[in-house]
Swiss-Prot record:
SUPFAM superfamilies: ALDH-like
Keywords: Amino-acid biosynthesis, Cytoplasm, NADP, Oxidoreductase, Proline biosynthesis
Highest rank taxon of the organism: Bacteria
Location(s) in or outside the cell: Cytoplasm
Broad enzyme group: oxidoreductase
EC number, as in UniProt: 1.2.1.41
Entry protein name: Gamma-glutamyl phosphate reductase
Protein's pathway: Amino-acid biosynthesis; L-proline biosynthesis; L-glutamate 5-semialdehyde from L-glutamate: step 2/2
UniProt-listed GO biological process terms: L-proline biosynthetic process
Cited function: Catalyzes the NADPH-dependent reduction of L-glutamate 5-phosphate into L-glutamate 5-semialdehyde and phosphate. The product spontaneously undergoes cyclization to form 1-pyrroline-5-carboxylate.
Catalysis performed (reactions): L-glutamate 5-semialdehyde + phosphate + NADP(+) = L-glutamyl 5-phosphate + NADPH + H(+)
Gene Ontology molecular function terms on file: glutamate-5-semialdehyde dehydrogenase activity; NADP binding
InterPro entries noted in UniProt: Ald_DH/histidinol_DH, Ald_DH_C, Ald_DH_N, Aldehyde_DH_dom, G-glutamylP_reductase_CS, Glu-5-SA_DH, GPR_dom
């Protein structure tokens, strides 16, 4: 596979994007007729094409990494940009896993006869055309393409300019897979230009694009949420909480508070604030202080919590809002379950929040009153993930209440339409 060394110059970006949109709309109608076997054949063929193109993928990725270093990208961004052999393996396995998932399209439920004699039910259908805007990670190209294809959606993928060579090499493999299954190449289109005007055009084409999914930093997501003329599936922050109730099992509380913070620091489902009931504080905070100190976690605590956290610095109002994505944790002691719930609903981001308790009553109240897309009892917030929820994979996590909420897998990329059977019925 020959590699081009630069992105093509496109004189009229808006016209180019509209052409992509028109082709995607036509392809989405064809995909509505595609069989599950045909979609799975394409996914397996994409996996084979990626496996055969390892050298090409690594060469393209080296060019992106070299350009990134020359442009001053920090090490964290370079790490996300890198396509290691293990990450290529993961992309290949991900395609095969999506192929093995049940196809939600065409599922019919709730069929019933009504007094008029008609039969009414619901059928699950694809959304149509999904636009994905993302940064850095080339593997998102494969993840998004596979989920959209399996759920019957055409997709337009606009990756970050820093990954343009990697994404174009991956796109070649995707096209090979589509061709092997006799599917239109426009079922998955990767935007070829790095011009930022492409994003503005993509999010302003309601006649072609049914939904936008942004994956990236807060600034990108805020801009798309503000400017998009089509629905957006997104979350802005991951300010996640663990609340240790007065009725908590101490060993569970320590294990969960440790894992939720220190298993990984950068994911959006990592705990950023620990709330502890005043009765539980002397039982769990000293042990947690030792654990966090051994792992280099900086604690920013309220005045009462600092009685058990000698090395903690005083928390400010900003700390309760903070998504650190780093070994930093805010800690607050509260007097009641009510105060904990109020804190979460005031400062949280409606992402994922957990309670540690042996009280069924307290657990049920927490589940009912915390306004988040995932609410947990006696489990680490790190479980808030499509794979861990048995969805197989996810396109992202939504903290909105419409259309999808929480990890968005195949079903979240579909909607339902009513279907009606009659036998010459007319309304009187």
């Amino acid at each position: 596979m020959a590699l081009e060394t630069s992105a093509p110059e496109i004189a009229d970006v808006e016209a180019y994007m509209r052409a992509l949109g028109e082709r995607a709309r036509d392809a989405s109608r064809m995909l509505a007729r595609a069989t599950t076997a045909q979609k799975n054949r394409a996914l397996h063929a994409m996996a084979e094409a990626l496996d055969a193109a390892r050298e090409t993928l690594e060469t393209a990725n080296r060019r992106d990494l070299e350009a990134g270093r020359a442009n001053g990208l920090d090490e964290a961004l370079l790490d996300r940009l890198a396509l290691t052999p293990a990450r290529i393996d993961s992309m290949i396995e991900g395609l095969r896993q999506v192929a093995a998932l049940p196809d939600p399209v065409g599922e019919i439920r709730d069929m019933r006869y009504l007094p008029s004699g008609i039969q009414v039910g619901k059928m699950r259908v694809a959304l149509g055309v999904v636009g994905i805007v993302y940064e850095s990670r080339p593997n998102v190209t494969v993840d998004a393409a596979s989920l959209c294809l399996k759920s019957g959606n055409a997709t337009i993928l606009r990756g970050g300019s820093e990954a343009i060579q990697s994404n174009r090499a991956i796109a070649d493999c995707i096209r090979q897979g589509l061709a092997a299954a006799d599917l239109d190449a426009a079922c998955v289109q990767v935007v070829a230009t790095t011009d930022r005007a492409a994003v503005g055009a993509l999010i302003a084409m309601p006649e072609y694009v049914d939904v936008i999914v942004p994956r990236g930093g807060k600034g990108l997501i805020e801009r798309i949420s503000r400017d998009a003329r089509v629905p957006v599936i997104k979350h802005l922050d991951g300010v996640c909480h663990v609340y240790v109730d007065r009725a908590a099992d101490d060993a569970k509380a320590v294990a969960i508070a440790d894992n939720a913070k220190t298993q990984r620091y950068s994911p959006c489902n990592t705990m950023e604030t620990l709330l502890v009931h005043v009765d539980a504080a002397p039982r769990v905070l000293p042990e947690l202080a030792r654990l966090y100190a051994s792992k280099g976690v900086e604690l920013r605590a309220c005045e009462r919590a600092r009685a058990w956290l000698a090395d903690a610095v005083a928390a400010t109002e900003d700390d309760w809002h903070a998504e650190y994505l780093a070994p930093i944790l805010a800690v607050r002691v509260v007097d009641s379950l009510e105060e904990a719930i109020a804190h979460i609903n005031t400062y949280g981001s409606h992402h994922t929040d957990a309670i540690v308790t042996e009280s069924v009553t307290d657990a049920r109240r927490f589940l009912a009153e915390v306004d988040s897309s995932s609410v947990m009892v006696n489990a680490s917030t790190r479980f808030a993930d499509g794979f861990e929820y048995g969805l197989g994979a996810e396109i992202g996590i939504s903290t909105d209440k419409l259309h999808a909420r929480g990890p968005v897998g195949l079903e979240g990329l579909t909607s339902e339409k009513y279907i009606v059977y009659g036998d010459g019925h007319v309304r009187s």
